[in-house]
């Protein structure tokens, strides 16, 4: 890629307003990716392995099922153990979402801001390893946010009402929500949640390892009993060392 076509000197990133020529095969492939997030993730998402470096992300069956649910349903809640790839699969879906949907805003919110920024970093690494013809041009790129030329944006922050107050989001991802203090979780849901839940196509994805009696516990058990609009997913797996969290997220 010519220097004048890259974003801030990064040869892996295309800057905005750079024309892109497509072959017929690339057009067909682009349309296939836009239609099917599972296909896109299976074929084009790469992650970092401590032992092997950058490798293709090979999804387990339960991860494919999660992507199907994210795509089909507006409200998802998942209870998963550590080392299950829970954050990696969500960020892979969110990357697909902002690439192939114009003018959408996504929030990655975690119990700690550095955790949210680390997840955005994983997404950004996957983005840098996409073929140029699958990329959108970059308007903004830092540790806390990402902005694409199609108008779509991602914000990474801690789970708090103040972090996202005054902003509208099409997708909110709440990571390790069981570890958010009760008073913060209550404040978040009372002030921010109504904005997104009132939309027709907005999505909420809540994922956590269980951690006591709290809002996540209530939302989960209400979902199990069909008493709220969340689609529940529970994964109980023991992984061998080759599927450790540092590989699958």
Q: Where are the regions that the model predicts?
A:
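Phosphate/NTP-binding elements of NTP-utilizing enzymes
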Residues: 2-241, 248
């Amino acid at each position: 890629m010519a220097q004048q076509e890259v974003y801030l000197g990064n040869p892996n990133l295309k800057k905005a307003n750079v024309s892109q020529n497509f072959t017929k095969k690339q057009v067909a492939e682009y349309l296939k990716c836009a239609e099917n997030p599972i296909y896109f993730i299976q074929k084009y998402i790469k992650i970092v392995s401590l032992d092997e470096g950058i490798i293709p992300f090979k999804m387990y069956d339960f991860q494919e099922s999660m992507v199907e649910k994210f795509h089909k349903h507006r409200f998802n809640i998942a209870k998963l153990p550590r080392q299950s790839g829970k954050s990696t699969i969500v960020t892979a879906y969110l990357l697909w979402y902002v690439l192939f949907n114009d003018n959408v805003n996504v929030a990655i919110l975690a119990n700690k801001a550095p955790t949210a920024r680390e997840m955005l970093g994983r997404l950004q690494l996957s983005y840098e390893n996409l073929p140029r013809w699958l990329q959108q041009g970059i308007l903004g790129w830092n540790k806390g946010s990402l902005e694409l030329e199609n108008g779509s944006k991602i914000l990474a922050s801690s789970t708090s009402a103040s972090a996202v107050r005054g902003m509208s989001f099409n997708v909110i991802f709440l990571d390790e929500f069981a570890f958010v203090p009760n008073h913060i979780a209550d404040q978040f849901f009372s002030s921010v949640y109504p904005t997104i839940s009132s939309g027709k196509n907005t999505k909420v994805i809540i994922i956590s390892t269980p951690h006591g009696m709290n809002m996540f516990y209530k939302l989960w058990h209400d979902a199990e009993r069909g008493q709220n609009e969340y689609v529940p997913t529970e994964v109980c797996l023991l992984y061998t060392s080759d599927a450790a969290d540092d590989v699958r997220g």
